[in-house]
Amino acid sequence: MEKITLAPISRVEGEINLPGSKSLSNRALLLAALAKGTTKVTNLLDSDDIRHMLNALKALGVNYSLSEDKTVCTVEGVGGAFNWKNGLALFLGNAGTAMRPLTAALCLKGATEAEVVLTGEPRMKERPIKHLVDALRQAGASVQYLENEGYPPVAIRNSGLKGGKVQIDGSISSQFLTALLMAAPLAEGDMEIEIIGELVSKPYIDITLAMMKDFGVKVENRNYQTFVVKGNQSYLSPEKYLVEGDASSASYFLAAGAIKGKVKVTGIGKNSIQGDRLFANVLEAMGAKITWGDDFIQAEQGKLKGVDMDMNHIPDAAMTIATAALFAEGETVIRNIYNWRVKETDRLTAMATELRKVGATVEEGEDFIRIQPLPLTQFQHAEIATYNDHRMAMCFSLIALSDTPVTILDPKCTAKTFPTYFTEFEKLSERT
């Protein structure tokens, strides 16, 4: 297996321009494909998850052209539901941001009835989709499980979404609600979506609503309990759509600056629609110096102290706090993060296991993790397993900010969101 060893870093300093956000890139491509008119999507992320969405759209008859560096995509919208030849199968890798929204969009009524199968890597078949399918069936959709009940692969008929009152469980993933919301305006009738349980990762719903508005559709949001969407609408191309830099990817560089130097990330700023920008507030609460601009966030080293916080609103960026916690004074507790367990891997168990390898004392709860800090000289050189999870690889690069090297297995798994991550991290790193 491939591996990379990072030697101890004495200081990090510099500026990094972030690649486009994964969540925004795949939403933008799907909305552009469903819309009337042509949309030029810029600062698109070039990564595995985006490639899976692009391949699926092509198979569904969507015409687009991609720039040579794959960061600009001009999409010709189909102006409504997709049409395809019966018997199509789409392979979506481990891309939740493609699997969930497409599951809903492909239920919409096509010109001629056809079936499509959505499948993916073995891990995708372990990632739940039941809450979304239950909701779609209430709206009149035809979705069948092909292997295990509640999980992909699924077979979908484009027999239409009638609308009406629909209940959806919000407690596992916000992607289910995002998928339903994005399909709802193209349903045959109005849809009233009621949330059951606590809605997790609310800021990701804000992203979805903001982007739907950019494509001409307004949703009535009644305090995140009920969402009302008029049916029989069309998405309208905004002609150009700029994808913000990935706020989750920013977290590694900002944390590095907070631990050992000064780093400025560009491509997101104080007006970003991504909830993960609030990661910078957590670093500030820990003692880092944070500066906000319209198009940048800067983090500068401060005396870090542990925090005890609910991080349900920033689930992806919260992982970075788990490794940064080793460099703080006092323990850190990250709470209300059960949905770490249904991501690319079970991130709670993975994080606890790998932190212990470098010498940390960690308590793993059902929906929390408690981490004791580690003196710089007491880190142990370990080989970090990454579980085919891009964020595990990136989080553990921070261990090199101690006095000990770190070896990361399968570093190329960062291709899911940030293929050049280790090159960029290296550019900011100084060694004595």
From Swiss-Prot:
One of its GO terms (molecular function) is 3-phosphoshikimate 1-carboxyvinyltransferase activity. Phosphoenolpyruvate binds at residues 22, 96, 127, 175, 347, 391, 416. It catalyses: 3-phosphoshikimate + phosphoenolpyruvate = 5-O-(1-carboxyvinyl)-3-phosphoshikimate + phosphate. InterPro entries: Enolpyruvate_Tfrase_dom (IPR001986), Enolpyruvate_Tfrase_sf (IPR036968), EPSP_synthase (IPR006264), EPSP_synthase_CS (IPR023193), RNA3'P_cycl/enolpyr_Trfase_a/b (IPR013792). 3-phosphoshikimate binds at residues 22-23, 27, 173-175, 201, 316, 339, 343. SUPFAM superfamilies: EPT/RTPC-like. Coiled coil: none annotated. It is found in: Cytoplasm. Disulfide bonds: none annotated. Its EC number is 2.5.1.19. It comes from the Bacteria. Pathway: Metabolic intermediate biosynthesis; chorismate biosynthesis; chorismate from D-erythrose 4-phosphate and phosphoenolpyruvate: step 6/7. The active site is at 316 (proton acceptor). Keywords: Amino-acid biosynthesis, Aromatic amino acid biosynthesis, Cytoplasm, Transferase. GO terms for cellular component: cytoplasm. The keyword Nucleus does not apply. HAMAP family: EPSP_synth. Catalyzes the transfer of the enolpyruvyl moiety of phosphoenolpyruvate (PEP) to the 5-hydroxyl of shikimate-3-phosphate (S3P) to produce enolpyruvyl shikimate-3-phosphate and inorganic phosphate. Belongs to the EPSP synthase family. Monomer. This is 3-phosphoshikimate 1-carboxyvinyltransferase. It comes from Actinobacillus pleuropneumoniae serotype 3 (strain JL03). The lineage of its organism: Bacteria, Pseudomonadati, Pseudomonadota, Gammaproteobacteria, Pasteurellales.
